[in-house]
């Protein structure tokens, strides 16, 4: 009997190691798939046939995004007609991809800035505040993962975000310091310390529920969420299989409508917020005892675009002042201020647009020979003060630079957000998923 128990224990350990082995070591390539891209119109629609060529490169596929029901505190589909068996059934179809790609680990994401939240009554905070509320969330999460064949769950917990910070010169910094004496600092969350402790409890309790089945538990630190406020790093890392640092969207036309600037630099720029870069975020987690092998750097597959005005000048050199909020969105993104990589690529100089004028004329591309901050492209306003645009974006080269940074630092890998904004049709150069391929090539 004793021998039998030992053998059963050894078998359980092997199964657990097998399921979690994809998050140990390095060169993780965690790919995000936004299920809503399946519902887009025309060429913007990412079908499962379009998705499949990417899966050979991904170590993980994160399907997003599930939501929290504020009444029951249960994990639920954000679109039942799309996700569940009563409709299109993408949950089961996506996890079924593992039969053809057995190396692939498929996880379900909750939150991820895709779940509707009342700013005055944030359900993600309310759930944390009660152990009785956490229980139905944990039970329903475990059930959903098991029912639909996912390999685990990723927490894209929607904590309150930092207040946007403006770029200040020397005089501006003096005035800001003087004003702060009287107004004080902006408080992101008055109960941040309590919520940090409660989130630690949630991670521990959730991992305890998932561990017997060997399920993976990941964390996505969403853009502009202050890690020092909400994450007790030493207390949670042992219960997490990986941490995706979404170190991008530091500057966006929604957060900073009057100032266009690099959204996702690797390193700090002069006279900018020292925290608004990849390296700062990585170093914070490393210094707080998160193993390097668990850290994955988030890389977006899109650009952020502002309208330039006559007062924005002619050079395009960031930060660009006197911007006028978000530029028009693309046919693919359908979101103001957001352009997918193929949408950006089509605006850069090419034979098809070299003779076009006005809003269709090509942008001027400015590369980054330092490999520290990123590319941008712009078109100053015309004589009528119209058609000005400034966009900073990720392309295969900048993504490869970040992958090289990850290798140099000995980190776990990269999280690409998301596949539907990479050039999945090969419209730009003929190569499908060029950003994904560039990252994978750098890891080889």
Swiss-Prot record:
Q: How is it modified after translation?
A: Glycosylated.
Which GO terms are recorded in the biological process aspect for this UniProt protein? carbohydrate metabolic process; chitin catabolic process
Pfam families found in the cross-reference section: Glyco_hydro_18 (PF00704)
Task: State the SUPFAM superfamilies in the record.
Answer: (Trans)glycosidases, Chitinase insertion domain
Glycosylated residues?
A: 226
Q: Which InterPro entries match?
A: Chitinase_II/V-like_cat, Chitinase_insertion_sf, Glyco_hydro18_cat, Glycoside_hydrolase_SF, Glycosyl_Hydrlase_18, IDGF
Here the disulfide bonds are: 31-58, 345-428
Q: By its UniProt entry, which Gene3D superfamilies does this protein fall under?
A: 3.10.50.10, Glycosidases (3.20.20.80)
The entry's cellular-component GO terms read: extracellular region
Keywords on record: Developmental protein, Disulfide bond, Glycoprotein, Secreted, Signal
Q: Name one GO molecular function term.
A: chitin binding
For the GH18 domain, which residue ranges apply? 27-444
Tell me where it resides: Secreted
The residue range of the signal peptide is 1-22
Recorded superkingdom: Eukaryota
* Membrane among keywords: no
List the PANTHER family. Answer: CHITINASE, CHITINASE-LIKE PROTEIN IDGF1-RELATED
Report the family membership.
Answer: Belongs to the glycosyl hydrolase 18 family. IDGF subfamily.
The note filed under miscellaneous reads: Lacks the typical Glu active site in position 158 that is replaced by a Gln residue, preventing the hydrolase activity. Its precise function remains unclear.
Q: In UniProt terms, what function does this protein have?
A: Cooperates with insulin-like peptides to stimulate the proliferation, polarization and motility of imaginal disk cells. May act by stabilizing the binding of insulin-like peptides to its receptor through a simultaneous interaction with both molecules to form a multiprotein signaling complex.
**Which protein, by its recorded name, is this?**
Chitinase-like protein Idgf4
Organism listed in the record: Glossina morsitans morsitans
Q: Which gene encodes it?
A: Idgf4
């Amino acid at each position: 009997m004793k021998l039998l128990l030992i053998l059963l224990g050894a078998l359980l350990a092997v199964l657990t190691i097998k399921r979690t082995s994809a998050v140990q070591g390095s060169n993780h390539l965690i790919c995000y798939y936004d299920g809503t891209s399946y519902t887009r119109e025309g060429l913007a629609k990412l079908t499962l046939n379009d998705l499949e060529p990417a899966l050979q490169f991904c170590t993980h596929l994160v399907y997003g995004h599930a939501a929290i029901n504020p009444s029951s505190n249960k994990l639920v589909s954000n679109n039942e007609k799309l996700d569940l068996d009563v409709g299109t059934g993408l949950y089961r179809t996506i996890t079924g991809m593992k039969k053809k790609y057995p190396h692939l680990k498929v996880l379900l994401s909750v939150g991820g800035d895709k779940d509707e939240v009342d700013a005055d009554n944030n359900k993600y905070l309310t759930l944390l505040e009660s152990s009785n509320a956490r229980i139905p969330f944990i039970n329903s999460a475990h059930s959903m993962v098991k029912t639909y064949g996912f390999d685990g769950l990723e927490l894209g917990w929607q904590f309150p975000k930092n207040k946007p910070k403006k770029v200040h010169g020397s005089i501006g910094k003096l005035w800001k310091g003087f004003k702060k004496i009287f107004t004080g600092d902006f408080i992101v969350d008055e109960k941040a310390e309590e919520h940090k402790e409660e989130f630690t409890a949630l991670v521990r309790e959730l991992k305890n529920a998932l561990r017997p089945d060997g399920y993976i538990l990941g964390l996505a630190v969403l853009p502009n969420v202050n890690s020092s406020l909400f994450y007790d790093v030493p207390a949670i890392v042992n219960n997490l299989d990986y941490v995706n640092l979404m170190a991008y969207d530091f500057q966006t036309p929604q957060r900073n409508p009057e100032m266009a600037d690099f959204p996702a630099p690797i390193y700090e720029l002069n006279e900018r917020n020292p925290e608004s870069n990849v390296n700062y975020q990585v170093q914070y987690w490393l210094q707080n005892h998160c193993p390097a092998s668990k850290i994955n750097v988030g890389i977006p597959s899109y650009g952020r675009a502002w309208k330039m005005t006559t007062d924005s000048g002619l050079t395009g050199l960031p930060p660009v002042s006197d911007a006028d909020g978000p530029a028009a969105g693309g046919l693919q993104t359908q979101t103001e201020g957001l352009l997918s990589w193929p949408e950006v690529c089509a605006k850069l100089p090419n034979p098809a647009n070299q003779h076009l004028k006005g809003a269709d004329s090509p942008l001027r591309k400015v590369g980054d020979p330092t490999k520290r901050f990123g590319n941008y492209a712009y078109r100053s306003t015309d004589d009528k003060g119209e058609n000005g645009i400034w966009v900073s974006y990720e392309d295969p080269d900048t993504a490869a630079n970040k992958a090289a940074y990850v290798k140099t630092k000995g980190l776990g890998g990269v999280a690409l957000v998301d596949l539907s904004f990479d050039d999945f049709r090969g419209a730009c150069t003929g190569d499908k998923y060029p950003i994904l391929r560039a990252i994978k090539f750098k890891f080889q």
